[in-house]
Each structure stands twice: as C-alpha cells, then as structure tokens.
Design a protein with these regions (language model features):
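Short beta-strand elements
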Residues: 760-775
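Short proline/glycine-enriched turn/loop segments at secondary-structure junctions
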Residues: 740-743
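Glycoside hydrolase catalytic-domain context in secreted enzymes
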Residues: 1-735, 746-754, 758, 780, ...
Length: 791
C-alpha cells in the first residue's frame, strides 16, 4: 500500500503528519539545514571549501556520503557557487536529487536555492540591472515583468527558492548594500518588493521569493556592515517592517531571511518577537524562515549570546528559524541541544513540519528533477526586459541643453567605466560575485557605453581614453578600503591614485566636440570592490582620482556630460554646476551601454526618478527625504540636505500643473480621499512625468515626518496633451505606530502635497479627517490607486 505521504491526492497536512511520524530525530535534523556542495554529474560531490582540493580527502567524502543518506533540507546555490555551464550543473543537481529520492530511507527531495536579485546568479543567465534601477523606473508593472523573467530562468535550471528581493530601506548611502535596495521610501520599497515577489513566485508560488534582510539592516551604526541598529518599535514598524508586511500580506511571500545585526541588543536570528510574534502570528506568514549565511553561528562567534553551536542552534530555531544556511555548522549539533534540554522534539517537529509542508506545496515529491533539455537562459524576452529596465531607470540630473546630442558629433569618451563591463554590474551579478572567490567569468553579453556609442555614431566619431583606473587589479582577499580615512592597513589591491592617464584624456577632449565622462564605482563583496556587501565607505567622493579627471576635463572648456554608474550616489564637489549634463544610470546590467547611449542620442527619454536622495555631503548622513523637522539640528546644519532630492529627474519636455482638488474636504477615519490634478505637456516633444503625492500629518500625538510618499503615477503625454490624474488614498494609509505597537489613524488636518519630486511640490491641498482615533485591523488598506483620463 502506498504510504500516505507519497499519495499526491491526499491533503498536505495529512502527508506531513504521516511523514513526520516515520522520521528518526536525525532525519528530522537533516531537514533543518542545507549543504553547500560542489556538485558533480558523476556523483562525486564534495563540500565547498576555501582550501584547495588536496585538503578535502577521502575521509571527508565518506563522511559527506554518510550524512547525505539522512537527507537534507536544502542545497545551497548548486549553479551559483562556481563556474559551471547550466546543463552540466543541472545534470549534477539531478544526480544528487536522485540520491535523495532513491538512496535515502524515506525519499525526501532536497530544495535547491539560488541568488536572484539582479537575475539568476549562474553562468550565462541574464544580467539584470540593480534594485536601485528597478526602483528608479517608478514602474511596478515593469519590475514584476523583470521578476517573471528571472523566475522563468530560475525554474528552468531546477531552482525552487530565490534569495531575493531585498527590502532594506536606504538610510545612509555610505552603506555598501545601498545598491541592493529599492530606495529610501518604505512604502515605495513595499510597492516594488510586492511587484517583484508576485513576478518571481507566479500565481502558483512554485518558486519561493525570500524577503531580506529582516529587519532594519540598512540603518546600522555608521552604515557599517553587520553593525548594531538602534530603533524604537514605532520607527521600526513604520519604516523598516512596513515593506515586509506589504510583501507578506499582498504578495504571499514564501520565505523570509533574518539579518545579521542586533536591534536593542537582540540579534535578528534569535529574535522570537520579530520572527514569530510579528511575522507569523500578527501577519499570518505561512512560509519558511531561512538563515542568512552563517547567521546562526554569529550568535556565539560575534554576538556572544551563546556558548557554542548547540546553544546557537537552539536559540535560532526556538525563535522561529526553519532552515540554517548555507550549511549545517550549528544544526549538526541539534542532537546535543535536545539532549541538553535546549530545544524540544516538539519544537523540532513543528519546524520540520513547515519545511515538509513547503516541499509538498512545491510539488517536489512528484516532480523532483529539472529538465536538462529545458534550460532557458538569455532568451530574447529576458534581454529585452533587462534593457527596458535599464533604459527607463536612467536619470537626468543636469542638462544645459546639450542633451539629447544632435547629429553625430566628435565625442571624447573618457573614464574608467566607459568600457568596463563589470562597472555596469552590481555585487550580486554572477561575474562580480565571483571576484571574492578569485574566479573570473567572461562578460561578453554586456554592452558597454563605448560599444553602444561606437555603434550609433560610428567608431571614427568616438575617441576613447580610459583617463584613470578605479582598481587596477580585481582580486580576492584584496581590501580596497574606499574612502578618505588615513591609517589604513596594507592594501593588496587599493583604489588607484595614479593620474598618469589623465593627460591622454585631456588631449582626447581637446580634439572633440563634446566629452562623455563615465565615472562611478566597481561592485565587489567584502572590499573586493568600492561598493557592495561589506564594501562600505566613509566618503561620498568618487573613488580614486576620478574627481581630478573630471576637473581636468571641465578645465578644457569643452562641454562635459558626466555619466555616473554604480551602487550609491556620489558628490562632484561643485562640478555639478560646471558640467553640461549629469546622468545617473546606477548599475544597469548587460543592456546598460545601450540604455545610456539611447538617452545620450535621444533615442530614449530619461524617465528615471531618484529613489535615494543625493546628499550635499557625507556630513549629512544618515539622510533621507522623509525626515523630522528637527533632523537638521539647531541651529540648522549647513551640510544637511540633498543636492538632488528624492523623486527628482529631468526629461525632454515641460509640464504645466493645474490646481489640485479633492472630492471632499472632510473624510472619516475609515474613509478615503480622492485627489485630482490636471497635467499638460507644454513642450515640443512627447514625454513622461511621474506625479507624486506626499502626505503630511500637521498635528499628531507623536512626532511625524515632514512628508511621506503615499501615491504616484507615471503619465506620458504628447505635446499639448492634457490628462487628469485622479488618486484614491485610503485614510488608513495615514497611519503610524503608537507606543503600544498598534497602528492607528488619528483625526486632524493632513496636507496632500502634489509634485514632481519631494522638493518640487506644485500643489498643496488640505483635508480634515474626522471621527475618533482608530486602531487599524490586521488587513488594513496599504495601496492607493490612480485613474488617468485624457482630454
């Protein structure tokens, strides 16, 4: 007779109960962790090690073989760990899965996870733009389409869980992982993350999105990776938890990953209040919680809240963790933890039940293998969508009329990022990610600005000069320490300080009609680059001698168009007023060169709008537009504020905004506000505007931000065309968190600020919210809507 757990016709909860009853404690523990392996299509799998293969002897192989007979919860990044072509990687993963299904006692399949923030992290997958690019499009539908394409590539290689998106809310752009965020507004982060999760998971949730880093990871001391976070619950809930709540409730996210840091002395991996009370009990999250890599071990190694690995495992799993990643450093000690009374088998059963539930839901027991002939990477649709995101995220910050370029001028294309494919990629793209492991992946699918401009203008019209290096040699274990601090340790691969190439760039400029200067940074993990995870900085000056290069180019008197790429905004130390144009393209991925060239030549409009403020200086940090009135200090600090505000971006045309109006000047606390505004294209070219609606609570029982984004809509208009935008905002969106942890809406006056950026407010309307203070229900309304009517 077929076992209940093998019967696909039985309800999932019955299958889980039957399987749990058959499992030994050791088999249960095995489901609570992953293995990080170098898989082999012949079955000679080995554990990933930083040591050379000669240290991984037969005894270790035998030990791994014995451990695998117990099964395993997950396999860590089978295609993303090393350079392997997809078909070979899938064949190797299938070989391991066949062992799980046929050579273990109960035949429980493994779940395979990969990174997928900016595309599936494996050889030959499409290299999508960064999350800052996603956010800068202000186009959730496009973000959802991008995630759909990433999901299709992931499914085609047998991936069931993607470790994305990142829901950290940017607060200090010195933080190296700023590039992974959707920006600095919590609601916009939530909107974009919700779109990404819906796209990646699909309607069936047959690929799990992973919300990370739960929570507040971006607000660490001094913007330093892993450093403590200091937040009260009101701000934690209103700013940092909000995007997670939205993605859980609106998109049914399948997984959550806690963060490395501690909040109020409690590390994220052992915080039962956040992992269980808030996430599961209050929000109704029904997926699995997976550790950030090594996060459980840090409980005793760094945080010092446990004595050993067994205690760390017990703390994390009791708090709400389901699976330790990337391997079993602490979970292997669970038997010891049970024997010592640190965790109960009842708790283990609860956790393993959740893991098995997800495997049954995913259909892994019925369809455990990937189709080796169904791999679909880099198809026409994925390339097209990646390029569309790159193009629509290009943001124009300055333009004295030189853009778009007319005809085919003689262009001096200068700068260290003009012809470097890696300069267009973010840290979690496959080629950049490999640098930390001293592996080099070819980047032929990346089109650089040089290649695109030479294609459009002709090679004879483009004179290229590198101008300077950012880092002369990319390598692992080579700290570059971006920034201005002295007293640095010996650097194996420092940021270059050589000015030897600048004269050649100046000569190129003098012999050209216009200069396109490409500057920025290089993404790399743990200081193998100037931005990225563990690559934080103390300065917002361009790395190396790029500022000197720009100054020399401006001094020629030729018009200089600056194209900045990278993972954080940088200041130009006053050159913003002297250059002819300034474009920010972030890390635009493999189609980035085309996107930049399309905007420069007028083939595309710069449609991007900033999702992180560009601070006046590093002294303003942490800086974000939705700050409090007193954030600038008393007396007001001259360095506080932004050079370019949140929501800002120029286009090719101009718009007239007619008076905003509301359907009713008074609304009840459980009602909604309808706000309308007319927009007319007064220019000579078709163009788009992002109409933004901010709300200010004029008087509240707690200190509130000066403004908060609550609605937006992009509208594209032909010359002379007018459209009416009618926004509907539930009053529930005007809420904040009271000291008792409850979300409330208070009666009173609220300003609705309608503008082209957070600083460019064109119209202000006041509404009066009436009634008594209202505590919001669990299923409160989180989204506004907009209807566009054309005249």
């Amino acid at each position: 007779m077929t076992a209940i757990y093998k019967d696909a016709g039985r309800p999932v909860h019955e299958r889980v109960a039957d399987l749990l009853a058959r499992m030994t404690p050791e088999e249960k523990f095995a489901q609570m962790h992953a293995y990080w392996l170098i898989l082999d299509e012949n079955g000679n799998h080995r554990e990933r090690s930083d040591l050379s293969d000669e240290f991984a002897g037969v005894s270790e192989q035998a030990a791994l073989s014995e451990r695998l007979k117990l099964g395993v919860g997950q396999i860590t990044r089978p295609l993303g760990t090393h350079i392997v072509d997809a078909k070979t990687g899938v064949r190797a993963a299938n070989r391991l899965q066949r062992m799980m299904m046929e050579e273990t006692r109960l035949g429980i399949p493994a779940l395979f996870h990969e990174e997928c923030l900016v595309g599936l992290l494996c050889k030959d997958a499409t290299l999508f733009p960064s999350s800052l690019n996603y956010g800068s499009t202000w186009d959730p539908e496009l973000v959802q389409r991008a995630a759909q394409q990433i999901g299709k590539e992931a499914r085609s290689v047998g991936c069931q869980q993607g470790l994305a998106p990142v829901l950290d809310v940017s607060r200090d752009v010195r933080w190296g992982r700023t590039e992974e965020t959707f920006g600095e507004d919590p609601w916009l982060v939530g909107v974009m993350a919700t779109a990404y999760v819906k796209g990646l998971q699909g309607d069936k949730r047959d690929l799990l999105a992973t919300l990370k880093h739960y929570v507040g990871h971006s607000f660490s001391e001094g913007a330093r990776n892993h450093a403590p976070v200091h937040l009260g619950f009101s701000e934690l809930n209103d700013t940092f938890l909000l995007p997670f709540e939205m993605a859980v409730k609106l998109a049914n996210a399948g997984s959550v990953m806690p963060a490395y840091h501690d909040i109020d002395n409690q590390p994220g991996h052992s915080d039962s209040f956040l992992l269980t009370t808030v996430l599961r009990e209050q929000w109704g999250f029904d997926g699995i919680i997976v550790a950030d890599y090594g996060g459980v071990s840090l409980l005793h190694q760094h945080h010092g809240i446990s004595h050993d690995a067994a205690e760390s495992a017990a703390l994390a799993f009791n708090a709400g963790l389901d699976v330790e990643l990337p391997k079993d450093d602490c979970a292997r000690h669970l038997a010891d933890a049970v024997e010592r009374g640190l965790i109960s088998m009842a708790k283990v059963d609860e956790i393993v039940g959740r893991v098995l539930t997800e495997k049954f839901r995913l259909g892994l027991f019925e369809n455990p293998y990937a189709d080796e002939n169904g791999i679909d990477l880099q198809n026409e649709m994925t390339r097209q969508v990646a390029r569309e995101v790159a193009t629509k995220s290009v943001t124009l910050l300055e333009n004295n009329g030189i853009l778009p370029l007319n005809g085919k001028p003689r262009v001096a294309l200068v700068g260290p990022t003009a012809d470097d494919p890696l300069a267009l990629l973010s840290g979690y793209s496959f080629p950049a990610h490999l640098i930390i492991s001293d592996m080099v992946e070819e980047t032929s699918q990346v089109t650089t600005p040089r290649a695109a401009l030479e294609h459009y203008l002709g090679a004879s019209q483009v004179r290229y000069a590198k101008g300077c290096h950012i880092i002369e040699k990319r390598m692992a274990g080579a700290p570059v320490f971006p920034g201005d601090s002295g007293g640095k340790p010996m650097q194996q691969s420092p940021v270059s300080q050589s000015t030897a190439l600048i004269p050649e760039a100046v000569n190129a400029a003098l012999e050209s009609d216009v200069v396109v200067a490409c500057v920025g940074d290089l993404a790399g993990l743990f200081q193998s680059g100037t931005v990225g995870e563990g690559s934080d900085t103390d300065s917002l000056n361009l790395p190396g001698v790029q500022q000197l290069l720009l100054e020399a180019l401006v001094a020629t008197g030729k018009p200089v168009i600056v194209v900045m790429t990278g993972g954080r905004p940088y200041t130009l130390q006053g050159l913003e007023d002297k250059v002819a144009a300034l474009i920010v393209a972030w890390a635009p991925g493999q189609g980035g060169g085309w996107a930049i060239a399309d905007v420069l030549t007028g083939r595309a409009e710069p449609q991007g709008r900033l999702v992180v403020s560009v601070p006046k200086s590093a002294g303003a940090m942490p800086y974000y537009y939705n700050h409090k009135l007193k954030s600038g200090g008393t007396p007001f600090a001259f360095h506080f504020g932004s050079r370019y505000p949140f929501g800002f971006g120029l286009g090719w045309t101009t718009f007239r905004w007619n008076a905003a109006r509301v359907a009713a000047s008074s609304v009840p606390v459980d009602g909604e506000v309808t706000l309308s505004v007319d927009i007319t294209n007064t220019g000579e070219r078709s163009g788009s505007e992002v109409v933004q609606v901010y709300v200010r609570d004029k008087v509240a029982t707690q200190v509130r931000p000066l403004q908060e984004l609550k609605a937006f809509q992009r509208v594209t208009l032909s010359p002379g065309e007018t459209a009416t935008l009618s926004f509907t905002l539930p009053v529930e969106m005007f809420n904040f968190t009271r000291r008792d942890g409850k979300r409330i809406v208070e009666p009173g006056e609220f300003e609705l600020q309608v503008g082209a950026s957070s600083a460019d407010i064109r119209q202000v309307v006041t509404v009066n919210v009436t009634g008594e203070t209202r505590v919001l229900p669990a299923e409160w309304r989180m989204l506004s809507t907009c209807e566009v009517t054309r005249a």
